């Protein structure tokens, strides 16, 4: 059986990237929470 995590930069960015986060209200709240916490990386 193959492992479930098969890394791909494109897929990673398309599902968890900054632009995707900004599209929905929930995603924007994620970015806001990470900004408030002082995260160095807001999104992938």
UniProtKB/Swiss-Prot annotation:
Molecular function (Gene Ontology), one example: structural constituent of ribosome
UniProt-listed GO biological process terms: translation
Cross-referenced InterPro entries: Ribosomal_bL34 (IPR000271), Ribosomal_bL34_CS (IPR020939)
Gene Ontology terms: cellular component: ribonucleoprotein complex; ribosome
Stored Pfam families: Ribosomal_L34
Keyword list, A-Z: Ribonucleoprotein, Ribosomal protein
Family of the protein in this entry: Belongs to the bacterial ribosomal protein bL34 family.
NCBIfam families cross-referenced by the UniProt entry: rpmH_bact
Protein name (record): Large ribosomal subunit protein bL34
Gene source species: Leptothrix cholodnii (strain ATCC 51168 / LMG 8142 / SP-6)
Gene: rpmH
């Amino acid at each position: 059986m193959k492992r479930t995590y098969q890394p791909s930069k494109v897929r990673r960015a398309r599902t968890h990237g900054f632009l995707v986060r900004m599209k929905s209200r929930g995603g924007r709240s994620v970015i806001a929470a990470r900004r408030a916490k002082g995260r160095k990386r807001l999104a992938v």
